Amino acid sequence: AKAIQNEKKRKAFYDTFAAVANKYSGLEYDNKSVYIAVIAQSPAELIREGELLDHCVGRMGYDQKFAREESLIFFIRTKEPPDVPFVTVEYSPSRRKILQCYAYHDSTPDDGVLQFVNLTWLPYANKKLRKIQRSAA
């Protein structure tokens, strides 16, 4: 009985995570840039990202914070190939700012990536966030 209860909780959590990812999918960015920003779709994606980039996004409660909408995780990718982990961003929707931005092994991304994140994606995401919040009000 406990296994069934745990499975129901896990499924409910995954459903909540997916609903949050869907709600904020408008903050994804794929315009005229070498880079794209995509939102994490599942806790499993966070684990994969953390393992491949050798940092802590797959552990330490980031999935819980995401499900509670405290912070959102976006993956910064190069357009080609878009599925290879590159840089991970933790974004606060309430404060509209980037909390963390790390490449492999918690290293600081290069200037081109930082410029994309701070000067291109962040203003874009904040503008889109206002639209999401207005439509929810």
Model-predicted regions and their roles:
Residues 1-137:
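Catalytic-core elements of nucleic-acid end-processing and repair enzymes
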